[in-house]
Amino acid sequence: MILTLTLNPSVDISYPLDQFNLDTVNRVSQTSKTAGGKGLNVTRVLSEFGEDVIASGFLGGALGQYIEEQIETTRIKQAFFKIKGETRNCIAILHEGQQTEILEKGPTIELKESEEFKSHLLKLFKETDVAVMSGSLPKGLNTDYYADIVRLAKEQGILTILDSSGQSLEEVLISNVKPTVIKPNIDELSQLLNYKVTNDIKELKAAVSQPIFNDIEWIIVSLGSEGAFAKHNQKFYKVNIPNIKVVNPVGSGDSTVAGIASGLIHQQTDEELLKKANAFGMLNAMEQQTGHINTDKFDEIFKQIEVIEV
């Protein structure tokens, strides 16, 4: 089973406007509300592809209940941990071809809740083969909280995928127990190394071979429209992708993570895993809805992706 963790989920609200006027009333004719968070995008895509997946994380208050109810309608398994705080809203105002976002920080997790959640995870780990950790940490959690989860998972023989950035990712990289997979984009890779990394293959090889990445089995670097670059143990790969009509790229990284998780749990070859991961990301970008793929188009896209050992 694949376990997805969304520790700072949200109710994502979208307000489309022809024009956004400051300091006055803006009336919205259509509103969309969805259960949001990077891990939930991963969950939905895995479920659409038919994988055995369960979603967990922190939920609280009326908004947390709304997320639970939304997930129930999709029949996706869930095992969220209830907290005293209120789950957050994230608002996107879509106007004149632009997107203005208002993101709440979310609840503060109490120390007791953070410790009890680890016990909650240990129960879920009994049936877990792959654990996916996505997104930011809520307030109240130590920056090394993901590192703690990776350690607990590894003790149970579980493969782990971490899709995070900033200090929470850095804490994992300096810990003595490493995740199976990390998936930085080129900007996040540059931030970790404190120098600008380009798409040049030699530069990418040197970058992912830095000591900070020692003992991480898979490093998969998204290169946007240029595909991806990957290191698996001592092998390096360049992934070339076909041109597609991009409808909505939001959530494509999360969909790529879903493909990685699917590849891991089925013990697929390096080429198959990388092609599946990139196909999932592209299929998401071809759809209007975030965290959604048209599985009928999977084979067509999969066949067009090229993986070259470099």
UniProtKB/Swiss-Prot annotation:
InterPro entries membership: Carboh/pur_kinase_PfkB_CS, LacC, PfkB_dom, Ribokinase-like, Tagatose/fructose_Pkinase
Family matches, as PROSITE patterns: PFKB_KINASES_1, PFKB_KINASES_2
EC number(s) on file: 2.7.1.144
Keyword tags: ATP-binding, Kinase, Lactose metabolism, Nucleotide-binding, Transferase
Any GO MF annotation of the entry: ATP binding
GO CC annotation terms, alphabetical: cytosol
Pfam name, any one: PfkB
GO biological process: D-tagatose 6-phosphate catabolic process; lactose catabolic process via tagatose-6-phosphate
Family listed: Belongs to the carbohydrate kinase PfkB family. LacC subfamily.
Family matches, as HAMAP family: LacC (MF_01557)
Protein name: Tagatose-6-phosphate kinase
Native source organism of the sequence: Staphylococcus epidermidis (strain ATCC 35984 / DSM 28319 / BCRC 17069 / CCUG 31568 / BM 3577 / RP62A)
